[in-house]
Amino acid sequence: MATMTTTVEAQPVAEPSSMRSVPGTLNVPVAKFPPPSRKDLSVDAEEVASSIVEAFNSAVSKNDLSAVSSLFAQDDGFRLKSIAIDRTSEFRSPKAMHIDNLDQVLGVQFFFTLETKIGTGQGLARLTEVGDGQWKFFTFYTSLGELKGHEELINERRPKGVEHGGQVGRKNWAERREMASEYQNGADPTVVVIGAGQAGLTAATRLKMLGIEALLIDQNERVGDNWRQRYHQLVLHDPVWYDKLPYMDFPPSWPIFTPKDKLAQFFESYATLLELNVWTSTSITSADWDKKTQSWTVTVTRKKGDSTETRTLHPRHVIQATGHSGKKNVPDIKGMSDFKGSRICHSSEFSAALEEQGRLGKKAAIIGSCNSAHDIAHDFVEKGYHVTIVQRSTTHVVSSKAVSEIALGRLFHEGGPSVEDADLFLHGLPAPVQKAINIQTTKLCAKLDKDMLVGLNKAGFKTDMGSDEAGLLFKYFQRGGGYYIDVGAAKLIADGEIKVKQGQEISEVLPYGIRFEDGSELEADEIVYATGYQNMRTQSQIIFGDKVASKLQNVWGFNEESEMKTMWQDSGHPGFWFHGGNLAICRFYSKLLALQIKGLETGLYRYGDF
């Protein structure tokens, strides 16, 4: 027997598969662009930008909120001292451009630098013409870059590394690193980061660059095992230009789509070269918050060679960086324990299809129809199995070519803008505006992918265009899944090499197959549940228990203001933070998370101020 190894009010998300989302999230409304004004780009963007910046700074210096509001197409307010146009690159300089993705609504875009009482940062503005020659802010985005007096320890502020001259008993670099990473003699990290994947690594690195002691702990034996131990054929579906990590770029010969084992090696090198403190083979046994001291008591069990040690740490912050998902989602279906085939497991436990089984004509059923399901089905086909994907609802499918060339190609490509500029451009749009643009982007992707989508639907595989037809990005942000970025399995489905069982829930697992609610049956020697994961809070409950988890807010999705919920911000429990997402999201938001912690540590602000 096998064993289970803007100002528009947001509305509640509807139930259709294309609109399904994580619990508690709201469906982001679609912003309306200003009506088309000019028919050409004959605008002096420099003059327009300079004029509105001058007016903005004048109003702010006088604390004239009415004058500030008059510069916006919609009312808003800001606490800034001044802004200045950023002309450090052609990409950042003021330019006339279309802002609606349809080449209809002309606007002026420019990057700017900003200053507040406690810090400096960057911003991105898009202007729209509301009258003949009258320009106002359509979108206005600001991002904190540095805290005054607490700048990152990079470039001209990098550490010296060694003090030259005679010094009795001086330790060399390797000895100093060993001492620093062990936290002996009562030393404690300021932050404990749980998980050493892309989320944990980026958070710890950002904190290190701000001079904050952070310790990464991971239950795996090696950094990178969170990728290394996944299924055999896994390759990143996003292109290399989108996936860069902060402070350390991929080599110029790096492949466009990164194999999982190669990424694992890079993670291990990243942790070593950036001198991150990492304890692998380490698990939390208890974690308690002391309200009086505003600190945690975290007890961990750590394997070191043939021995095991128990350590107690007292950090002031804990970051859960175990991925933006929680416990694996395995439906409780009648008969699962009676399955007599060779394997039944969740996709997280699947390593590879077995070629010797494929040669015997074995049958595999994959429950689910998103990225992991397709990759695993693809692997089974290549090993000679008869394969069926069980698709219960619909899936958004887009080719990796469309993602690379259309969805991301404008910003992330060879010779494109820096990732810092591209990130600011990408995240510098309010979610409703981003959704409006993505509706158009999704249509362009579908046009490129027309033959692929027709082939899938003819084969019985049902596709959708995502929430409000906004495609991949909003499937990810509102649901955390529900999509497949095609790297080859779509053709296998269209050609009939991967069969599809569509639209039926499973009523029972049989000894050698599956029975559906309509009474039909599917033979299977192996069953893989590619059914995703539960909310990130479920992992919090496992690690920290109900006492902590009950105070945490729902994670992921959007709130009433169309902002992401709980991630990278106040979690509902002091000293507790969530961080996760793909490599690009971790790259961007890790800095904002680290700056919040630095601000708390330096007394620049307190819990509840942000």
Name each model feature, range by range.
Residues 8-28, 103, 111-181:
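Short beta-strand edge/turn micro-motifs at domain boundaries
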Residues 2-65, 71, 178-188:
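Short, low-complexity N-terminal intrinsically disordered segments enriched in polar/charged residues
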Residues 192, 205-232, 385-398:
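Glycine-rich FAD pyrophosphate-binding loop
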Residues 76, 228-265, 396-463:
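Glycine-rich active-site loop/strand segments that organize a redox cofactor
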Residues 182-217, 370-381:
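N-terminal Rossmann-like FAD-binding beta1-loop-alpha1 element of flavoenzymes
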Residues 5-7, 74-128:
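Surface-exposed, charged secondary-structure patches
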Residues 143, 260-365, 369-371, 378, ...:
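Flavin (primarily FAD) cofactor-binding/catalytic cores of flavoenzymes
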Residues 164-189, 344-361:
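A short, basic/flexible loop-to-alpha-helix module at the beginning of a structural domain
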